[in-house]
Amino acid sequence: MKILVINGPNINFLGIREKEIYGEGTYEDLCKFIKDEGSKIGIEVEVMQSNIEGEIINFLQAAYNKVDGIVINPGAYTHYSIAIYDAIKSINIPTVEVHISNIHTREEYRRKSVTAPACIGQICGFGFYGYVMGITALKNMLSK
C-alpha cells in the first residue's frame, strides 16, 4: 500500500517558526518520523512539500491512479484554496487532512477549512503523530 503525504506552505520551516505552536521538531524530523512509522505498519510513504499552490495541485493530480491514499496538510491554503479542494475532489483518492496544531483553537480565520469537505476526515492538534493517525486510518479503511 502506498500513501502520499503532501505538506503545504511553511511546513518546511518546522523547528524554526512558531515553536510554541508547532514544536521543536524540524521538517526533516517529520519526514523521517512519517516514513519510519509507515514502514512499521507496512505502508510505503512518499512525502512532498511545496509553498506554491499550483505545485500542490500538480502533486495531487500526479497521484491519480498511483497511490492508495493521501494525507495532506495544506497549511494556510486550508482556509481559502478552492483550487486544492477541487483537485482533491477530482482525483477520487481517499484523503485525510492533517494539521499539527488544533486549528479550531487558533485565530478565528484559521478555524474554517475549505479543503476538509473534500476529504474523508480531518485530524488536528496531535503534532507530528497526527500524520501517523491519518496513515493508519487510511490503511484500516482501505484494508476493508
Swiss-Prot record:
**So which domain of life are we looking at?**
Bacteria
* Record EC number: 4.2.1.10
**Catalyses which reaction(s):** 3-dehydroquinate = 3-dehydroshikimate + H2O
A GO molecular function held by the record = 3-dehydroquinate dehydratase activity
The record's annotation in Pfam families points to:
DHquinase_II
> Which sites bind substrate?
N73, H79, D86, I100, S101, R110
Q: Name one GO biological process term.
A: amino acid biosynthetic process
Where are the active-site residues found? Y22 (proton acceptor), H99 (proton donor)
User: What InterPro entries does the database record attribute to this sequence?
Assistant: DHquinase_II (IPR001874), DHquinase_II_CS (IPR018509), DHquinase_II_sf (IPR036441)
Catalytic EC class:
lyase
Site Transition state stabilizer: which residues?
A: R17
Question: Which positions are tagged coiled coil?
Answer: none
Per UniProt, the keywords (alphabetical) are: Amino-acid biosynthesis, Aromatic amino acid biosynthesis, Lyase
| Biochemical pathway | Metabolic intermediate biosynthesis; chorismate biosynthesis; chorismate from D-erythrose 4-phosphate and phosphoenolpyruvate: step 3/7
Q: What does this protein do?
A: Catalyzes a trans-dehydration via an enolate intermediate.
Q: Partners and quaternary state? A: Homododecamer.
**What is stated as this protein's family in its record?**
Belongs to the type-II 3-dehydroquinase family.
Q: What is this protein called?
A: 3-dehydroquinate dehydratase
Q: Which organism is it from?
A: Clostridium acetobutylicum (strain ATCC 824 / DSM 792 / JCM 1419 / IAM 19013 / LMG 5710 / NBRC 13948 / NRRL B-527 / VKM B-1787 / 2291 / W)
Give the source lineage, highest ranks first: Bacteria, Bacillati, Bacillota, Clostridia, Eubacteriales
The gene name reads aroQ
